[in-house]
Amino acid sequence: MTANNAMLTKETISQIAHRLHQAEQSREQIRQISLDHPQITIEDAYAIQRQWVDLKINEGRVLKGHKIGLTSKAMQASSQISEPDYGALLDDMFFQDGSDIPIDKFIVPRIEV
């Protein structure tokens, strides 16, 4: 077991963060991470997120805030977790009111209401 009770190695966490980063840049969907790493933990997922955010910040993005997701019990159940999750919001994730949102910026766009 690695630090922070994570089941994935630091190298694997870094590789996954880079895969996600490349997928965003190429706009190509990748295979669900948990299918390749069924032992992944919540701690691993947050470690991957931190590495991915670091990659973005190193490219010039700016951390603007945080978000909470999966706040409903139904969404938590569908994701097989028992608590809300959280994530970082970077400057390139915001759009001005009334502006057009470039659909080609996203791989599989969805709207959460």
What are these regions (language model features)?
Residues 8-113:
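Active-site microenvironments in enzyme catalytic cores
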